[in-house]
Amino acid sequence: MERIKYLLLFAAIALVGCQVSDEEDSLIGKRKNKVEEVAYARAFKVGVTPTMDCLPIFLLKDSNLYNPDNIDIRLKEYSSQLNCDTAMQNGRVQASVTDLIRAEYLKEEKHIVLDYMTETNATWQLLASPQSGVKKPEDLGNKIIGLTFNSIMQYLTIRVFSGHDISSRFYGSQINDIFIRLKMLNNNQIDAIWTSEPQTTQAKLLGNREIYSSVNENFIPGAIVYVNNPKIEHQRAFEAAYNKAVDILNSHSIQYFAPLIKKYMKVDDKVVAALPKITYKRVIAPRERAINKARNILP
């Protein structure tokens, strides 16, 4: 009987000990969550898309090319520029990839406070599916093109239409998600789409044809912007890390960074192997004439 009482007492003590331990674990977990919430709120968050113009940002983040005591960089990954826009509008990011036309639209129409950090090497290509019968811009009559409105894609679409003898009008369909646009093209659900690298190479490998490219334009539209005037010390730290990443990227072939490209852009080795040579730019402000052009392009 005494032995049973002893065992029951021991079990009760053990149970109380477990309860205290669980309460401590819960309290520690809550404290950790609170610390992370505060750290996240203070972090320098960057809106990115799964495209090659974001590769310097992916590299500086994954390779820790910055002093974490000076800046805590967090990536906000989006598969559409529209989601980046929403993040900028709601103050969820301190910097974001975009294009000049989009940035000027957001400043003018949405009253978002944006400042240009740098131009980028981003280019855009118009690709048509084999089943569309489109082999050149003149064949685009009565076709449907997937794009994002109020952006470089809309500008380029207007340029294609005005610069070529197209017998009948074609139509723009707003499809914002990069992956959905590509999937629709490959499934013959749309005649043509605007893409950027690496999706351009991915689409070409699947038999789609390039009809037009932004490299034909005397205009450099790719850009990275600051949102709502982040701290100057954070801007300087981010730019220093960005320049380090650019120097590293330019010292190797693009295929050297295959793991990084596959991780963030969801492509395979075949696509990476076929990517064209890309030279990245250190931080350089967009040209004033390019900004003025973007400002006056869309109504």
Task: Describe each region flagged by the PLM.
Residues 2-9:
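Sec-dependent signal peptide recognition
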Residues 65, 160, 202, 260, ...:
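Residues within well-ordered alpha helices
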Residues 19-29, 71-72, 150-173, 240-279:
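Ligand-binding clefts/hinges and TM-proximal coupling segments of bilobed small-molecule sensing domains
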